[in-house]
Swiss-Prot record:
SMART domains membership: AAA
Pfam families: RecA, RecA_C
Keywords: ATP-binding, Cytoplasm, DNA damage, DNA recombination, DNA repair, DNA-binding, Nucleotide-binding, SOS response
Organism: Ralstonia nicotianae (strain ATCC BAA-1114 / GMI1000) (Ralstonia solanacearum)
Gene: recA
The name this protein goes by in its record: Protein RecA
The keyword Cell wall biogenesis/degradation is annotated on this UniProt entry: no
Annotated GO biological process: DNA recombination; DNA repair; SOS response
Length: 352
């Protein structure tokens, strides 16, 4: 009996001490700096579409998560910048503000416009050094008014000491230290301001690797740890119209995912000058989900024929955007992914 009273008394003292500690923390760091998980509802992850229906499904939550760091890497001409510009276009459709930090000094504004990016509204910076690029990113994140920042690319974030030094100077680990410091500084602010930051990265080969993949990404290991999502993008084939190559068949693997199960893959077409062939994906996934019926070469929707052959069907959906959106939303519902255009950023602000 006495033991029970003693235990209850100790438990009450512990609760009292915990309440005092929580009050002190809230007084020092502000309300909401610490809370019990049961006190607040777990909010669903806010996402922005990648512009590819298949990749949105592979990501498990319907797109790239906001308030997180994302890394997109792959070989040259695999579609890294194209995919990222599609994300920019999707964020702008929701009414978001986007910034593109072009460390490679290679952004093709005309191509971005063709992919649906509202170029006059896009914030563009072409910094001289890696430090300058990351300081600009930090300032934009801290402002709380930017919804998406793209840094193209990590390999081009050259430290100031390297630019000011001589050719051939050995400066080991300088870029890795720069990235590590920047990510330590950025991560907390990115979460608070709900800004999505995408780092585009290149592939390098490790020398003397006997077992496992010799491939690695630039900028050290920090980005691998801080990124919530890592996408490996590869070109796996060409799309031809007669003898002319009109696009690439692309495969994206979700190498890391902190918001849904990883290691899923998506295969889609990237057409030159047009970007990801959304209509092609709607047809393929629509047939899989039995939303679109396929009989021989003919494709039908709700009992009505929409085209003979995949190319004709794709062209029909491109010309009938409302029908394409209707089919896409049915496919998304079937696959358990958020419907397109469900909530815009303006509506989110009004709700708050």
């Amino acid at each position: 009996m006495e033991d029970g009273k003693k235990a209850a008394s100790m438990s009450a003292e512990k609760q009292k001490a915990l309440a005092a500690a929580l009050a002190q923390i809230e007084k020092q760091f502000g309300k909401g700096s610490i809370m019990k998980m049961g006190d607040a509802e777990v909010e669903p992850v806010q996402v922005v579409s990648t512009g590819s229906l298949g990749l949105d499904v592979a990501l498990g939550v319907g797109g790239l998560p906001r308030g997180r760091v994302v890394e997109i890497y792959g070989p040259e001409s695999s579609g890294k910048t194209t995919l990222t510009l599609q994300v920019v276009a999707e964020m702008q459709k929701l009414g978001g503000t986007c910034a593109f930090i072009d460390a490679e000094h290679a952004l093709d504004v005309t191509y971005a416009d063709k992919l649906g990016v509202k170029v006059p509204d896009l914030l563009i910076s072409q910094p001289d050094t890696g430090e300058q690029a990351l300081e600009i990113a930090d300032a934009l994140v801290r402002s709380g008014s930017v919804d998406l920042i793209v840094i193209d690319s990590v390999a081009a974030l050259v430290p100031k000491a390297e630019i000011e030094g001589e050719m051939g100077d050995a400066l080991p680990g300088l870029q890795a230290r720069l990235m590590s410091q920047a990510l330590r500084k950025l991560t907390g602010t990115i979460k608070r301001t709900n800004c999505l930051v995408i780092f585009i990265n290149q592939i390098r080969m490790k020398i003397g690797v006997m077992f496992g993949s010799p491939e690695t990404t630039t900028g050290g290991n920090a980005l691998k740890f801080y990124a919530s999502v890592r996408l490996d993008i590869r070109r796996i084939g060409s799309i031809k119209k007669g003898d002319e190559v009109v696009g690439n068949e692309t495969k994206v693997k979700v190498v890391k995912n902190k918001v849904a199960p990883p290691f899923r893959e998506a295969i889609f077409d990237i057409l030159y000058g047009a970007g990801v062939s959304r209509e092609g994906e709607i047809i393929d996934l629509g047939v899989e989900a039995k939303v679109v019926e396929k009989s021989g070469a003919w494709y039908s929707y709700n009992g009505e024929r929409i085209g003979q052959g995949r190319d004709n069907c794709r062209e029909f959906l491109r010309e009938n955007a409302e029908l394409a959106r209707e089919i896409e939303n049915k496919v998304r519902e079937h696959l358990g992914v958020t419907p397109m255009g469900a909530v815009t950023l303006a509506e989110e602000v009004e709700e708050d």
